């Protein structure tokens, strides 16, 4: 049996057989903290902000499992390195009375596109911990082993020239293609929310060169 449906004309039930199985397309479960913590504890722990659809609560998946469907043993989330938070804020869920399940991610900036650019990234101790030119997922998961599971991105006044030189591909190319005005708006918005800071003085050291 592939599916049992109910007619809208006379309410009788119809059975459709599926010899090769059923592929169910019903969305994911990023809007359900219970399922997120149970099925993807690592991905959940390194997430600072999420732009999911609130309706993605995994109800279709739960119904399918109840009916006997197989569920992947490991979750396969696509995490982007663009959810930014203020200093001192850890990655992972925080309590939220207004959110479904009473939990939400702390960040309100979910798509800071320049975050994907391979600028220097350091943990809370000022230590570089990963290859900044790695794909979206890699730098985020590398942060799982750092204090608070977060990091800081450091750039200078040559940011736009550097972005052009990096010439990243995929959706991260938006920062390069959109130009100076777009980049400035992104930085200004982050600064207003306490997530982006302009340095007044810079000091060099042997450690920075290393």
Name these PLM-found stretches:
Residues 58-65, 155, 184, 205:
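Predominant activation on well-ordered alpha-helical scaffold segments within soluble catalytic domains
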Residues 50, 61-153:
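Rossmann-like dinucleotide-binding core of oxidoreductases
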Residues 203-209:
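Conserved small/polar residues in nucleotide/adenosyl-binding loops
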Residues 1-15:
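Conserved beta-strand-loop-beta-strand element in the redox core of flavoprotein oxidoreductases
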Residues 8-10, 21, 28-30, 125-128, ...:
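Short, glycine-/Ser/Thr-/acidic-enriched flexible segments
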Residues 143-202:
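Glycine-rich loop/linker segments at domain edges
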Residues 16-89:
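Glycine-rich loop(s) and the adjacent beta-strand/alpha-helix scaffold that form part
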